Amino acid sequence: MTQRRDFLIGAAGVAVGAVAATTVGKMGGKEDAPKMSAPAVQTKPTDIIKWRLQTYSGAPLGAHVIKPQIEAFNKAAFGEMEIELYYADQLVPTDELFRAMQNGTLDAVQSDDATMASPVDINVFGGYFPFSTRYSLDMPVLFKYYGLDKIWAEAYGEIEGVEWLSAGAWDPLHIFTKDPIRSVADLKGKRVFGVPTAGKFLSRYGLVPVTLPWDDIEVAIQTGELDGVAWCGFTEAYEVGWADVCSYALLNNVTGAWCGSYFANSNSWNALSPKLQELFKLSMDSSHYYRQVWYWGGEAKLRVEGKKMELTEIPKAEWDEVVADSESFWDELASISPRTEKVVQAYKEYSHVMEKAGVPYRY
């Protein structure tokens, strides 16, 4: 058996012999002497692929829901590609995001299907689908294990020029207002900035959904054009300044998570190398993870420690009636097409499993 001491002595002898041979070779001018090669230096490519990506969100919110992802992607792409990030309405109005991406004005978009007016039957499930989820983790599970990923891919696969890439969860939906809401009757007549599908449902109770440019919302609340927002959860309300102009926060939430997606122009996406495509997919996953943590922690902390808004609540008996009403709303959306029926069925199946699973999935 070779002993450690013998091995070290032998290795040292080989090293000395190699150095001697190299020295003799150099002194004798022999061309076949061993040569040391310079270390490889990685250089950035000269031709950079540039993308323009616009998000639905304004800059204060975008600093969390997408900016870290894009900065990390640009760094990791090492000069092969650079994504220029634009916020709500900077290049095109939010409701024109889809068409702008389809015609190549934009290379990619981050938005929900409904807000950007996607011409697909399933767009009603983008954003806030009332009472479809309890927690933000529900959303990725629905896409991964209950078939929503295949349904979304099928729907957008029928439209030329656009690729659906990935979906993820954002925050729960609460209502923030200047005047308190302590009963369902208090919803009547309140003009709120809100997302399409949830707004349509809440209009059953007299709430008035209003669409305005994202950056105009704070001023619209201050001037009385709006009575509040039904667009987000506590984290966003505090982050973007809406908590500064709203006095009350309704604890009853309309759903547990906002459903948003990433999309790309087909030509822009197909022009990328497989490596860059995978890198962008990884960056989307990193953004999904960032949002899960940011929202989950923020919602709880601000409910407990936030001091800008007074918390109100609609009594459970009244709110249970609203939840029950959502069943007919689900059926209404299911009747749009065979595909929307599949989506509703997936949500129903998932809800059944979660309720049957019990704590901690449902309480």
Segments from the language model and where they lie:
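A gly/proline- and charged-residue-enriched helix-loop-helix capping module
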Residues: 136-151
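Short, solvent-exposed secondary-structure boundary motifs
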Residues: 151-157
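N-terminal secretory/targeting leader peptides
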Residues: 2-138, 157-158, 162-363
